[in-house]
């Protein structure tokens, strides 16, 4: 009975928070499976983990990290920083001036900066970069001994 009451009170508190229209900045961590991770209208930090994840920052200058799976990461509004990871990721900057880094994993990623006027992408030679990225830097690895 006590557990049920606590659950009801927690649900009521969440409803009050949502009805108040308050969106607080957040740090969100994914699980080892596939996740849909969506931020707030404030500045968020979102870390995907394992699985094929979907990450969206919404408004605000967000920092978004793809995880180990084949992830889709969407910046939305705000000057976002987006980082790919192992796996074949699809990274979208969307609105504002974004920085996207898919370099260093050696796996083909798709990078689309968006409608900002000063987007920057750091990529590998194998990555597919859409034409809307204004500043593109190619990671070149030197040969080892």
Positions of PLM-derived features:
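Alpha-helical hydrophobic membrane-insertion segments
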Residues: 6, 20-21
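Sec/Tat signal peptide C-region and signal peptidase I cleavage site
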Residues: 21-27
